[in-house]
Amino acid sequence: MASAVLSASRVSGLLGRALPRVGRPMSSGAHGEEGSARIWKALTYFVALPGVGVSMLNVFLKSRHEEHERPEFVAYPHLRIRTKPFPWGDGNHTLFHNPHMNPLPTGYEDE
C-alpha cells in the first residue's frame, strides 16, 4: 500500500515538472471580470430566484392551512409574573400581544 502511494507521488511529480507552467493559474488575478459576472448571474438565476419562488410557495401554502386549536390555559405560578406594569397600554398586555394566542395571568381574553 505504501509503495503504491509513493509511486503515485513520483509519477505526479514527474508529470508536474514536464508540463509547462503558464502564468499563475491559482492567483486571484487569473480570473477575469467576465467570468465573475457570469458566475453571479448564474447564481442569481439558478439559486436566488428559485429560492424566492419556493419561499413564496411556502407562504402561500401556510396561509391556506387551517387553524389549530390553542392549548388549554393552565395557570402555572412561575409564568406570566407581573411585578410591575408594562410601560405601555394598560400595563397588563405585552407589547406584541395577541388576544387569541397570548394569555394574560388570568387566562385568555376572548373566552
Curated annotation (Swiss-Prot):
Pfam families: COX6A (PF02046). Coiled coil: none annotated. It is a single-pass membrane protein. GO terms for biological process: mitochondrial electron transport, cytochrome c to oxygen. SUPFAM superfamilies: Mitochondrial cytochrome c oxidase subunit VIa. GO terms for cellular component: mitochondrial inner membrane; mitochondrial membrane; respiratory chain complex IV. The chain crosses the membrane at residues 37-61. Keywords: Membrane, Mitochondrion, Mitochondrion inner membrane, Oxidoreductase, Transit peptide, Transmembrane, Transmembrane helix. Gene3D superfamilies: Cytochrome c oxidase, subunit VIa (4.10.95.10). GO terms for molecular function: enzyme regulator activity; oxidoreductase activity. Pathway: Energy metabolism; oxidative phosphorylation. Residues 62-111 are mitochondrial intermembrane. Residues 27-36 are mitochondrial matrix. InterPro entries: Cyt_c_oxidase_su6a (IPR001349), Cyt_c_oxidase_su6a_CS (IPR018507), Cyt_c_oxidase_su6a_sf (IPR036418). It is found in: Mitochondrion inner membrane. Its main location: mitochondrion. Residues 1-26 form a transit peptide. Belongs to the cytochrome c oxidase subunit 6A family. Component of the cytochrome c oxidase (complex IV, CIV), a multisubunit enzyme composed of 14 subunits. The complex is composed of a catalytic core of 3 subunits MT-CO1, MT-CO2 and MT-CO3, encoded in the mitochondrial DNA, and 11 supernumerary subunits COX4I, COX5A, COX5B, COX6A, COX6B, COX6C, COX7A, COX7B, COX7C, COX8 and NDUFA4, which are encoded in the nuclear genome. Component of the cytochrome c oxidase, the last enzyme in the mitochondrial electron transport chain which drives oxidative phosphorylation. The respiratory chain contains 3 multisubunit complexes succinate dehydrogenase (complex II, CII), ubiquinol-cytochrome c oxidoreductase (cytochrome b-c1 complex, complex III, CIII) and cytochrome c oxidase (complex IV, CIV), that cooperate to transfer electrons derived from NADH and succinate to molecular oxygen, creating an electrochemical gradient over the inner membrane that drives transmembrane transport and the ATP synthase. PANTHER family: CYTOCHROME C OXIDASE POLYPEPTIDE VIA, CYTOCHROME C OXIDASE SUBUNIT 6A1, MITOCHONDRIAL. This is Cytochrome c oxidase subunit 6A1, mitochondrial. It comes from Rattus norvegicus.
